[in-house]
From Swiss-Prot:
Participates actively in the response to hyperosmotic and heat shock by preventing the aggregation of stress-denatured proteins and by disaggregating proteins, also in an autonomous, DnaK-independent fashion. Unfolded proteins bind initially to DnaJ; upon interaction with the DnaJ-bound protein, DnaK hydrolyzes its bound ATP, resulting in the formation of a stable complex. GrpE releases ADP from DnaK; ATP binding to DnaK triggers the release of the substrate protein, thus completing the reaction cycle. The lineage of its organism: Bacteria, Pseudomonadati, Pseudomonadota, Gammaproteobacteria, Alteromonadales. The keyword Chaperone applies. The J domain is necessary and sufficient to stimulate DnaK ATPase activity. Zinc center 1 plays an important role in the autonomous, DnaK-independent chaperone activity of DnaJ. Zinc center 2 is essential for interaction with DnaK and for DnaJ activity. It comes from the Bacteria. It comes from Shewanella baltica (strain OS155 / ATCC BAA-1091). The keyword tRNA processing does not apply. This is Chaperone protein DnaJ. PROSITE patterns: DNAJ_1, DNAJ_2, ZF_CR. PANTHER family: CHAPERONE PROTEIN DNAJ, DNAJ HOMOLOG 1, MITOCHONDRIAL-RELATED. HAMAP family: DnaJ. Residues 5-70 form the J domain.
Amino acid sequence: MSKRDYYEVLGVSRDTSEREIKKAYKRLAMKFHPDRNPGDKTAEANFKEIKEAYEILTDADKKAAYDQFGHAGVDPNRGGGGYGGGQGDFGDIFGDVFGDIFGGGRRGGQRQAARGSDLRYNLELSLEEAVKGLTKELRIPTLATCDLCEGSGAKKGTSATTCGTCHGQGQVQMRQGFFAVQQPCPTCHGRGKIIKDPCTKCHGDGRVEKSKTLSVKIPAGVDTGDRIRLAGEGEAGEFGAPAGDLYVQVSVREHAIFVRDGNNLYCEVPISFSKAALGGEIEVPTLDGKVSLKIPAETQTGRMFRLRGKGVKSVRSHAVGDLLCKVVMETPVNLNDRQKELLREFEATLTGESKKHSPKAEGFFDGVKKFFQDLNS
């Protein structure tokens, strides 16, 4: 009877991640585990099939061979004698030979337990939080060391035993014609040990899915794109190997008033026509509260004022940026009759004196006049 496709056995697609494969395995292993189905031969057969599929699809070398050659690529009985072992074995042999030559293959000896994967957490902050700094409580979904077996993967009271196929070496020698090469042991996958009685909680993986809460200090001055590394706070490693790291990726939300550029802040401040013409003091918002800003008489709209030290403290030095305020003159609206009359009277006083009171406007209209004269000449 031909074997079922390993991906079909676990109910996953060929592009599924290793983490999803592990989740599918754990779900099915719990369903068909012999301890839960005593005396059920069908469940026992299903469990063995699931375990075999899992062992192949979570081993990078075996998975690659299976994806290319199917079951023939991972059948240890097809490795003996001559070139009659089939295309799958021939390809695997040359893959290992050239992998060793160019540094891609494993050296002899047991496979080292893999370091835990790094994790990334996207943290969104307000501008105020980013500028002042704070401590955040982050809830991180991860793989943690199984507390029942303490990461060994073996059932409580038992331990891993020496592999009978490779006798603890983690490697087996295979011959193909004139070639003799070492490959990871297909039984223990290079570990040199096998777990006969897997832990009932982690099912032999040594790790379980878990969420943990971390208190993370965010330094003052961080900005979008900054990354904070927390060593050892990633996923737990395999069978006691070091854990990965956690990287907190910072992004800062847009602010209703301020725009940040490096350590400087920018904002627009509206002023009245009379304030721009006569001058005076206005209140300007900063991240530390309101401050007074003196507006000189005859200030034009768009003029920039710099408030030194009112920007952002650099996260990498003691430098502090500035706050740059651009004043924008507002045209008055909803005028009553008296206000309109006063503006007409004011406008009348400017007749014949536009160069004196509006030099930029007069210069602009002189330029327009000259442009049309040159055009018609």
